[in-house]
Amino acid sequence: MKRRIVAALVTALLPLGVTGCSIASKTSACEELSGPLKEAGVALVNARLGEAENPGESFTKLAEAYETASAKITNSEVKASVDQVAADWRTVAEKAQALSADPAKADEEKIQDLQAAFEQLNTHQTELFHTCGYKY
């Protein structure tokens, strides 16, 4: 009788233990993002204020920061989301670089491409925030 009770308790509590590990893994994975998120905030403010001499370089550094964080993340859900955000920062960097290379020749299409890249980045960054449970 006692064995059955113990077996039932172990069976009932085992999923909770596994879930706890998953949550801890997700939490530690999301903690790796604190540096890149701070860098992203500063870079965006500087770019918006026109203080960044080369926004493309700033955005490339952000992509690298996310890639560095991703290398330390083992949670597959968070890692996939971080990798997507890093790729989006690279795309934004390329589009910004194309515009800043010759601002006099910036056409409407290049501007729209950059805006679309930022929208895509915003979508994926928001998904990452939801994955990590960040409130904003």
Model-derived segments and spans:
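Membrane-proximal amphipathic alpha-helices
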Residues: K26-C30
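Alpha-helical segments in soluble extracytoplasmic regions
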Residues: E32-P103, D107-T126
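Short, low-complexity, Pro/Ser/Thr/Gly-rich segments in the mature regions of secreted, periplasmic
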Residues: H124-Y136
